[in-house]
């Protein structure tokens, strides 16, 4: 039984899908005007884990994450670079796939784009106007916020409280300061589309509502995104979607916490803005992912090199213990009476599932993984090992790896199994037999230069990535 924290109700709830065995999930994606920063990477990783765990529990997950390819930031970037908005969007969509692919984020079921849904957006807005929920004014179209009775229910703010901070900017023609834009009148030199309201382009909030409706229907199971999107973006999505669809927009709302850099808010003005495109050249993407899930998704996370190094060390411990188990598999036998280890492994797996069932607590799931590694390290020191126990260890390691999306071997691990490396190890073994220790040391140093560390053990030579 999976429970998750629902921002809408401010409490944990048992997950009950609309359709048995299926999860319809919409995650707000990036505005594709630049490479993604690590703040964008966090929801991509966290909700990828949520998806993976649902799939592990037997659900079919329809995972939709959009690209915002029409936006003020894109238009500004196109003017700066003297390139078209579609050209810039294509470049950074490709970069996004490359970056999150490096972080082992699975491809979405669908990645809808605003430009591909322009006719749908225009019709959606027209429907809202026809029903009295929206109005045209000065070439713009606004949503009539006070007409929607549930406005403020996600952010838990009354409409009167919201009114206090609202204002009408110069050039806006709103009936009420709380009303928000559905359609923006075209400005000279900006990309625009023809519509019944005149030339223009959609507002940000309406884009997600329409893409979610088109891809997943009037009501979805889970809508997710960063905490910064809770208001006004997700609040406005609810208002326009439920006014249009006459149905709840999403049954569960999930929001991940912020990322700070050395205990400061990440911002360009502070010079601590970290792009994934840059950081994965310095930090192993697997380590970055492991670091991101080492904290519960709803909690803020502090990024600094010391904490990343701690994550690297922790992941290395897990991988080294798995390598030891793989090596012992070569000499394991079918001995019996090792039920104690089987029971302990099962207990760790049960604990992993328990904490993941409790609002996807990856921090505690990693603790369970450490405990599995500790038990594995103890087991390989036994005089005799059982094939059954070894296989059980390997199976549970693989479950943890698949659910958390962290590979059991580094992306360079295949190099350790390369035919040339194996031949060098064999040659070194032969040199030692022949007492040619100079050659044996030479081969050892050669492999070390490739980050391959050899260790002589009673069970033979084993190697690991340094």
Curated annotation (Swiss-Prot):
Keywords: Aminoacyl-tRNA synthetase, ATP-binding, Cytoplasm, Ligase, Metal-binding, Nucleotide-binding, Protein biosynthesis, Zinc. It comes from the Bacteria. Binds 1 zinc ion per subunit. Its EC number is 6.1.1.16. Its cofactor is Zn(2+). It is found in: Cytoplasm. It catalyses: tRNA(Cys) + L-cysteine + ATP = L-cysteinyl-tRNA(Cys) + AMP + diphosphate. CDD domains: CysRS_core (cd00672). Zn(2+) binds at residues 28, 208, 233, 237. ATP binds at residue 268. GO terms for cellular component: cytosol. InterPro entries: Cys-tRNA-ligase, Cys-tRNA-synt_Ia_DALR, Cys-tRNA/MSH_ligase, CysS_C, Rossmann-like_a/b/a_fold, tRNA-synt_1_cat_dom, tRNAsynth_Ia_anticodon-bd. GO terms for molecular function: ATP binding; cysteine-tRNA ligase activity; zinc ion binding. It is an enzyme of class 6 (ligase). One of its GO terms (biological process) is cysteinyl-tRNA aminoacylation. A motif ('HIGH' region) lies at residues 30-40. Its main location: cytoplasm. Gene3D superfamilies: Cysteine-tRNA ligase, C-terminal anti-codon recognition domain (1.20.120.1910), HUPs (3.40.50.620). A motif ('KMSKS' region) lies at residues 265-269. Monomer. Belongs to the class-I aminoacyl-tRNA synthetase family. This is Cysteine--tRNA ligase.
